[in-house]
Amino acid sequence: MKKFLKVWSVLTIICMTVVVFGGALVTKTGSADGCGNSWPLCNGQLVRLTDVTPEKLIEFMHRMTTGISSIFVIVLAICAWIYMKNRRETKPLAIIAVLFLIIQALMGMAAVVWGQNPYIMALHFGISIICYASIVLLALMIFEVDRKFDARNLVMGTKLRINIYALTIYTYLAVYTGALVRHEKASMAVPVWPFENGKFIMPDSVQDYVQYFHRVAAFILIVWLLYVTWLVFRDYRRYRVLTFSMVLSLLFIALQAVTGALSVYTGVNLYIALAHSLIITMLFALLCYLCLLASRSKSNRLRIK
């Protein structure tokens, strides 16, 4: 059973990664209306080879991979619930994974049938990364990563725990601003990075405001992440799980900044934009894992005593 769970959890992560990629691809290529206003089929029927368009194919494939991923997520949640029922985080994570998967699908359906609001569609991406993060956490528990890094002896102080919780919430909000950039079609609102002609110019449109707000949010995220990394290496260097996680998070945020800048300089190159979406999804999942470790800190302290 354990071997099956390991293989299944990896396959589920791969499936959900494809879903995240697919959602970003739908947005980047303007394929959201590729299947008309019917759901789950395309214009009320299966796609026929005689009338396939790139937009229709992308949208239909996204719906199909979402359906397949739903099966993987539900099976993983049920098996983890049964096999790891003695772990206190298992049931909440399984519920979150399935619940947010359903919400994500319903929001996608609503956007197709009743039209798309950029602010709601930006939240659609936010829902998907919560589902993704919960699946990653279940997989890490299945692979017993805690034992490999001796995380069971990890004790965090209040300052670090609060910073990790707050940073994770803030990262989610920063992700929302990035998704809003895509859905408001503001990617090239300010075509020079970080500012136009090297200096700040007052925005004069909604797209300008959205783009500037995202860049400021991203800058704050980088600074905050550097601060938390400094805290970890100053006070918690003996815990490999923390130092490794923070180094990995710095790598993710550096790649995120680079792909963000390149997105502007390349006129929103499709592959760079997709990488930009995937990297922040993985960073959010990593921060959620740190939140999981922080939530165990008190019980670890009591057990060690």
Swiss-Prot record:
Pathway listed for it is: Porphyrin-containing compound metabolism; heme A biosynthesis; heme A from heme O: step 1/1
Q: Which InterPro entries match?
A: COX15/CtaA_fam, COX15/CtaA_HemeA_synthase, HemeA_Synthase_type1
* GO annotation terms (biological process): heme A biosynthetic process
Q: Active site located where?
A: 59
Q: Which residues bind heme b?
A: 214, 276
UniProt KW keywords: Cell membrane, Disulfide bond, Heme biosynthesis, Iron, Membrane, Metal-binding, Oxidoreductase, Transmembrane, Transmembrane helix
GO annotations of cellular component type: plasma membrane
Q: What is its EC number?
A: 1.17.99.9
Question: What superkingdom does the record give?
Answer: Bacteria
Q: How does it sit in the membrane?
A: Multi-pass membrane protein
Q: Where in the cell is it found?
A: Cell membrane
Q: List the disulfide bonds.
A: 35-42
Binding residues annotated for heme o, in chain numbering: 62, 124
Transmembrane region(s): 7-27, 64-84, 93-113, 123-143, 161-181, 213-233, 241-261, 272-292
Q: What family does the database annotate?
A: Belongs to the COX15/CtaA family. Type 1 subfamily.
Q: How does it assemble?
A: Interacts with CtaB.
Q: What is the protein name given in its UniProt record?
A: Heme A synthase
Gene source species: Listeria welshimeri serovar 6b (strain ATCC 35897 / DSM 20650 / CCUG 15529 / CIP 8149 / NCTC 11857 / SLCC 5334 / V8)
